[in-house]
């Protein structure tokens, strides 16, 4: 290869792995960390790994855009903190909408850099923006995985921060987002007894 000529873009599985590496690299610098197996790691990076792990269990052989979207669902989330928006429901919704657009644009830039075609980039971005939830099976699968990861890995922290009435409200809203299959899987999660009781009361 002559001097000044850039390396060709990766293709196939190597392109997917490079995209994941770039997503993880972007997430690794987050200021919010948690202790995982004796090492402090960015919360966004830990979350990304939870998402991939749960998707692999929930839908083995998921299409590539869905696998990509799961990995970058919260990419660099710390860049747009909740505190920038008004308190209350309207401020929360504005924050979530702004985050979805930010995640889609950030992921799109990485995907184009590693050689993905526009149709794949746009598909991943649509998944991240949750376009056509309930009508698009892949969007619904992503939402199911998000909810399952929340229940399995983050509900305990929420339980420590909110009263019981608030928790039940959160759980009911989470349940409404899920498909019947997602709900069935949720009921099999290995939750602490107090959390399982809360879930059963919320959805019973």
Which residues does each PLM region occupy?
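Divalent metal-dependent phosphate-bond-processing catalytic cores, especially two-metal-ion Mg2+/Mn2+ enzymes
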Residues: 4-21, 25, 38-42, 49, ...
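Flexible, glycine- and charge-enriched loops at secondary-structure boundaries
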Residues: 41-44, 93, 97-100, 164
């Amino acid at each position: 290869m002559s001097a000044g000529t850039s390396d060709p873009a990766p293709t196939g599985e190597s392109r997917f792995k490079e995209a994941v590496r770039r997503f993880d690299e972007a997430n690794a610098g987050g200021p919010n960390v948690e202790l995982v197996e004796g090492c402090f790691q960015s919360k966004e990076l830990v979350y990304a790994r939870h998402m991939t792990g749960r998707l692999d269990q929930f839908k083995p052989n998921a299409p590539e855009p869905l696998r990509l979207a799961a990995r970058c669902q919260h990419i660099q989330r710390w860049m747009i903190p909740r505190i920038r928006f008004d308190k209350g429901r309207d401020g929360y919704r504005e924050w979530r909408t702004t985050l979805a657009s930010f995640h889609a644009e950030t992921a799109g830039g990485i995907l184009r850099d590693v050689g993905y075609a526009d149709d794949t980039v746009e598909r991943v971005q649509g998944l991240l923006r949750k376009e056509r939830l309930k009508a698009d099976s892949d969007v619904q699968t992503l939402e199911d995985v998000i909810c399952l990861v929340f229940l399995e890995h983050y509900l305990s922290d929420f339980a420590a921060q909110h009263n019981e009435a608030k928790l039940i409200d959160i759980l009911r809203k989470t349940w409404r987002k899920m498909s019947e299959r997602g709900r069935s899987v949720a009921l099999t999660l290995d939750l602490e007894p107090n959390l399982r009781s809360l879930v059963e009361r919320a959805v019973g």
